[in-house]
């Protein structure tokens, strides 16, 4: 696969690869850990769509909804916890009777705190390059 900008950089860290949008590194990492591990991680992060477990998944070849994609990034800003998303929080009648209330619950941690810190640091690098 081509990298953003069409250049290859040789051996780089994952932080540099993320900052420079190096697709070749994403593909290599997927081959190393295996496509099934990528799919499992995506599902753990909140992606619910069916994903094809192949090496091209690193390039975004499986379709997901915008909500899934957005919610998959939330654990990085939320201490590793998966979001408990509700669009409708409460439904009441005109006189105030509650028909529905989404009290929410405690969301499960889906990423270890040390991984959250590393990823946040690497994602910050994407805007500092």
Label each PLM-derived region with a short phrase.
Residues 16, 63-129:
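A penicillin-recognizing enzyme superfamily signal
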Residues 2-78, 122-125:
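Active-site-adjacent helix/loop patches that line small-molecule binding or acyl-intermediate pockets
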């Amino acid at each position: 696969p081509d990298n953003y900008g069409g250049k290859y950089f040789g051996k780089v860290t994952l932080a540099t690869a993320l900052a420079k949008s190096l697709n070749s590194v994403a593909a290599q990492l997927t081959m190393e850990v295996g496509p099934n591990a990528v799919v499992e991680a995506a599902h753990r992060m909140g992606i619910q769509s069916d994903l094809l477990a192949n090496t091209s998944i690193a390039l975004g070849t499986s379709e997901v909804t915008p909500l899934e994609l957005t919610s998959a990034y939330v654990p990085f800003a939320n201490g590793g916890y998966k979001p408990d998303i509700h669009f409708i929080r409460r439904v009441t009648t005109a006189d105030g009777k509650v028909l529905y209330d989404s009290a929410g619950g405690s969301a499960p941690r889906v990423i270890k705190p040390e991984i959250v810190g590393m990823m946040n640091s690497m994602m910050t690098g994407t805007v500092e390059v």
